[in-house]
Design a protein with these regions (language model features):
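C-terminal peripheral helix-coil segments that are non-catalytic and often amphipathic
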Residues: 1-13, 144, 148-152, 166-167, ...
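N-terminal, Lys/Arg-enriched amphipathic/low-complexity engagement segments
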Residues: 10-23, 30-31
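Generic hydrophobic, amphipathic alpha-helix propensity
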Residues: 25-36, 53, 78-86
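Helix-turn-helix
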Residues: 35, 39-73, 77
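Alpha-helical DNA-contacting segments of helix-turn-helix folds
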Residues: 40, 75-82, 138, 142
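Hydrophobic alpha-helical connector segments
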Residues: 77, 90-114
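Short linear capping/connector segments at secondary-structure termini
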Residues: 91-94, 121-130
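Amphipathic alpha-helical packing segments from all-alpha helical-bundle domains
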Residues: 102-106, 110-113, 129-155, 163-167, ...
Length: 224
C-alpha cells in the first residue's frame, strides 16, 4: 500500500554529514562512527563533543569537522548507519492479526535494544532535529511494513487512512518504550507487554476483534 499523506515537514537544519567519496575517506568516516558508538556505551549524547570524538578515534580535529560540521550531523550519520543495517522485521504466520502484530513488535523491540548507542539516540533525548526526522521517517516505514504484512493475508476494512494510523500505532509503541528507557535505562517486560496491548487496542478500534483471512488466487480457483 502507498502512503497518501503528505511528506513529513523538514525542519531547517544545515547539519548533514559530508559523505566521503574516496576509499580512505570512507574508512576514516567509518572509524569516526565506530568511535562514537564506543563513546555512547558509557556516555550520554549530551556529553560527547566533536573534540571528544577526535581524541577517541585518534583522528585530527580538522578531519572530524570536515565530515561533521557539528554534533547533530555526527549523530545523524550514526543513526543513518544503524537504519541502513537493520534486518527486515516479519510478522510471523499466526491465523490472527493480533498475534502477528505482537510478533512484529517483539522482533522490532529486540532489534532496537540490541545496541546501547541506538537506545540512547532512539529512546533518549534526540540529539537534534536531523536524528528526530530520521526516526519519524523510520516509524513511517515500519508502519507501512506492518500494514503490508497484515493486508497481504487479511481483509482490512476499506480506508485511505491506514498508512497514517499504522504510523500512529508505531509511535504509540515507541512512546511506551521511550518512557520505560527514560525511567529504568532499559525496556522492562511490563512495558514491552504494555506497548503490545496499546497498539492492538488502538488498531482493534478500527479493525474489530476479528479480520477475515484473504482468499488467495490459487485458493479461489479451487472454489470455482
Amino acid at each position: 500500500l502507498t502512503d497518501p499523506s503528505p511528506p513529513l515537514p523538514r525542519r531547517r537544519y544545515t547539519t548533514l554529514p559530508r559523505k566521503p567519496q574516496r576509499k580512505n575517506g570512507r574508512e576514516k568516516f567509518d572509524t569516526l562512527l565506530d568511535a562514537l558508538d564506543g563513546l555512547l556505551q558509557f556516555r550520554e549524547t549530551s556529553e560527547i563533543s566533536l573534540s571528544d570524538l577526535s581524541e577517541a578515534a585518534g583522528v585530527p580535529a580538522a578531519s572530524v569537522y570536515h565530515f561533521f560540521p557539528n554534533r547533530e550531523a555526527l549523530f545523524a550519520a550514526l543513526m543513518q548507519r544503524h537504519l541502513d543495517s537493520l534486518p527486515d522485521v516479519s510478522a510471523g504466520s499466526s491465523p490472527n492479526w493480533q498475534s502477528r502484530t505482537e510478533h512484529f513488535l517483539d522482533q522490532l523491540q529486540k532489534q532496537l535494544c540490541a545496541s546501547e548507542s541506538v537506545m540512547k539516540m532512539r529512546f533518549g533525548p534526540a540529539p537534534g532535529w536531523a536524528v528526530r526526522e530520521l526516526l519519524l521517517e523510520d516509524r513511517n516505514r515500519l508502519g507501512l511494513r506492518l500494514l503490508d504484512y497484515l493486508d497481504t493475508d487479511f481483509e482490512l476494512p476499506a480506508s485511505p487512512r491506514w498508512p497514517e494510523r499504522f504510523r500512529v500505532a508505531l509511535t504509540i509503541a515507541e512512546g511506551i518504550w521511550s518512557g520505560a528507557y527514560g525511567r529504568f535505562g532499559r525496556i522492562d517486560d511490563f512495558n514491552i507487554d504494555e506497548a503490545k496491548r496499546a497498539v492492538i487496542a488502538y488498531l482493534e478500534y478500527f479493525f474489530g476483534e476479528r479480520l477475515p483471512l484473504r482468499i488467495r488466487e490459487e485458493e479461489e480457483a479451487l472454489l470455482d
